[in-house]
Amino acid sequence: DSVFGVHESPRNLEAKLFGWNVTKTFCARNGLGLIVRSHQSKQGSLGFEVMHDNLLVRVFSARDYESHGNCGAVLLVSRDDERDLLHVRPQVLHSLTKALDGVT
């Protein structure tokens, strides 16, 4: 969470990197408590990453994407009607390759 402001991404010219301050301002202006994004694998990751003071979650569902050894993940969303809240919990989908190691 050390990035501040908006910067060009090293991935390509169209993409941007944005810091925690941008996320915080965007959420405050739009009445949001969480942003969920996808479409970016991180090598060796658990398939999700919580960032920007818990305001941003990156989730990637494809396991072992391009042989990166990453786990996939999904977000489980449930509702608490008493407190009018949504609960969001990551669930890791472990790599089939690693799960099958040693199985004959």
Question: What do the predicted segments below correspond to?
Answer:
Residues D1-T104:
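Feature recognizes metal-dependent phosphohydrolase scaffolds
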